[in-house]
């Protein structure tokens, strides 16, 4: 009977260390249960009553730990679902704000008609500059990283959140800035010691 107590304690320890899974644990408990039934039918004097009581107490404690674990997992799962719903809601609002912002005058394109002949009905789309606040944020980052002007993915995401631009717009801005702005910045800020 002491062997069964040791087996259940070892199984409990292995389970909580993730050395065995639910299926293995059930097999161990069923084997112990079968052994106890066999042992009980051969134990006519009842000398192992104390061992049986200890085994029952250990199993009850183990059972309560397993129930606690399942409750924690279900609470965690519920919180994950709630968090995902909140994130979806935030993303929806952000998309709506972005759509409204892109529709605003700051990012609207101006069509100019060309004069003359066949081209009179065609339109020319003018290149749009970003607002000064956005350019200032991006230039500040560029100035800070003159030696290696390539933002990482994390930095791009941070700049995207800070400016409200899409990642592709951030990429394009830096590609253009490395050709147009960076040479002048390097001349201006190089230290002539």
UniProtKB/Swiss-Prot annotation:
InterPro entries: HD, Homeodomain-like_sf, KN_HD, TALE_homeobox. SMART domains: HOX. One of its GO terms (cellular component) is nucleus. Gene3D superfamilies: Homeodomain-like (1.10.10.60). Pfam families: Homeobox_KN (PF05920). GO terms for molecular function: DNA binding. One of its GO terms (biological process) is regulation of DNA-templated transcription. It is found in: Nucleus. Its main location: nucleus. Residues 123-185 bind DNA. PROSITE patterns: HOMEOBOX_2 (PS50071). PANTHER family: HOMEOBOX PROTEIN TRANSCRIPTION FACTORS (PTHR11850). Belongs to the TALE/KNOX homeobox family. This is Homeobox protein HD-12. It comes from Encephalitozoon cuniculi (strain GB-M1).
């Amino acid at each position: 009977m002491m062997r069964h107590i040791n087996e259940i304690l070892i199984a409990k320890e292995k389970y909580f260390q993730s050395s065995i899974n639910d299926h293995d644990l059930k097999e161990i408990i069923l084997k112990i249960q079968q052994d106890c039934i066999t042992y009980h039918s051969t134990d006519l004097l009842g000398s192992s009553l104390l061992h049986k009581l200890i085994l029952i107490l250990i199993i009850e404690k183990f059972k309560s730990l397993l129930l606690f674990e399942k409750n924690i997992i279900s609470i965690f799962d519920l919180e994950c679902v709630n968090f995902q719903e909140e994130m979806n809601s935030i993303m929806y609002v952000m998309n709506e704000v972005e759509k409204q912002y892109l529709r605003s005058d700051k990012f609207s394109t101006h069509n100019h008609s060309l004069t003359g002949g066949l081209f009179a009905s065609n339109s020319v789309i003018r290149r749009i500059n970003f607002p000064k606040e956005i350019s200032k944020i991006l230039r500040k980052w560029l100035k800070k990283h003159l030696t290696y002007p390539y933002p990482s993915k994390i930095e791009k995401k941070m700049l995207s959140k800070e400016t409200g631009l899409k990642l592709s717009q951030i990429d394009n801005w830096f590609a253009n800035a490395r050709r147009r702005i960076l040479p002048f910045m390097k001349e201006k800020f190089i230290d002539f010691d």
